[in-house]
Amino acid sequence: MTNPLWGGRFTTSSNDIMKKINESISFDQALYEEDILTSIAHCKMLVNQKIISKYEGQLIIHGLEVIQKQIESGNFEFSTDLEDIHMNIEYSLKKMIGNIAGKLHTARSRNDQIATDLKLWIRKSIKKLEQQLHKLQSTLLNIAENHYDTIMPGFTHLQIAQPVTLGHHLMAYFEMLKRDRSRWQDLYKRMNQCPAGSAALAGTSFPIDRHFIAQELGFDSPTENSIDAVSDRDYIIEFLSNASICIMHLSRLAEEIILWCSYNFKFITLSDNITTGSSIMPQKKNPDAAELIRGKTGRIFSSLNHILIVMKGLPLAYSKDMQEDKEPLFDAERNLILCIEAMNSMLNNITINSENMLKAAEHDYSTATDLADWLVKHINLSFRESHEITGQIVKLAEHNKCKIHELTLTQLQKIIPSITEDVFSVLSAKNSVTSRTSYGGTAPINVLQAIKNGRIYLENTD
């Protein structure tokens, strides 16, 4: 038997290998809700334009609603012989209401149908991601507020650089997630044009109303060019690009969590309910959730690479290659949401070891920059001169195996005679962070203001 929906030109049916490589219902059934929404909007338009009768439209819409309930209750049998979600639904509709079902496909193609379905699905996914990122930002704010003045070492090159506060450090990730959310919002606006009614590629001779379908489905307008409408997958590429940037941010935080809970750092302790053990080493408590976030980052990156490679050589308009757009999209979205949830769970199940953070912040001459700044302010040196002198003082402390503030004033005056005892006031980690009051700096008073601004942002974007 040839395919019941496109087999008129064929005398034999597809062989098993062709069916196997051609089917997409095994994964595009995830689009059933969007496909039915698109079909209902298209059907309403056909009725409004008197292309089909009101009675026919009612039959079709009722049938589609029944099919949706069947799918959601698990009572719908998908068939690989029918290739994809569109044909599975249409064939089931035909069995239910007869040949009238065939009128639903008037003035449309699977090409514009799938493009519309995918945009609807991505819009829904953006809303889910926004909700999850909002929760994660709220968690970061809560921890930052509890630790707005908790001192920890700031790092460059993974070497202790300057003291900062944990609240300030976590608010850096809050800002990253703000940018991530902004990118999702920008994508939503840019992609919110409706491909429905573009048909295969050239539009249609039927007197359709594309503006009606666009409005019915919540789009801002119809797409402007029918060829572009069915061949465009920019919105998938942008979605995966945004997902890649977002998961990269999560991966950086995951890497820090892995470091911080290690024996060498001991900055944090992860709860048992978000860690795992070893099958051979009974003492182990592994940060597997963080490691899996880090690992899944490569998986999401590869999804973006996948679709870029698929699209790079395709002539206009539609090619079957584009069927390969869905699995990486669905996989990336599913894993990104899981990673956001896992990160949120980890952060809600950590204990901050503040004393260890402070001890680490006081090591490796972390206040050397404060000393250099003091020399500029009080001895009237250029920063380059103070940098050179501070380097000599650090070298002296290293030679004496002590911290800078443990050097005596006499020892310091051998390097720079005009230095006074006031210099010791800037050499503690606490005084260092308190002094960093420049806009966006790590001073606790700044962190509290940033947290306040963050809460206003979350209220306005809830």
UniProtKB/Swiss-Prot annotation:
Pathway(s) this gene product operates in, as recorded in its UniProt entry: Amino-acid biosynthesis; L-arginine biosynthesis; L-arginine from L-ornithine and carbamoyl phosphate: step 3/3
MF-aspect GO terms: argininosuccinate lyase activity
Keyword Acetylation belongs to the record: no
Catalytic reaction list: 2-(N(omega)-L-arginino)succinate = fumarate + L-arginine
EC number: 4.3.2.1
One Pfam entry name: Lyase_1
Class in the EC hierarchy, top level: lyase
Highest taxon of source: Bacteria
Compartment annotation: Cytoplasm
GO CC term (a single one): cytosol
Keywords: Amino-acid biosynthesis, Arginine biosynthesis, Cytoplasm, Lyase
CDD domains: Argininosuccinate_lyase (cd01359)
GO terms classed as biological process: arginine biosynthetic process via ornithine; L-arginine biosynthetic process
Annotated PANTHER family: ARGININOSUCCINATE LYASE (PTHR43814:SF1)
Family: Belongs to the lyase 1 family. Argininosuccinate lyase subfamily.
Name this protein carries in UniProt: Argininosuccinate lyase
Encoding gene per record: argH
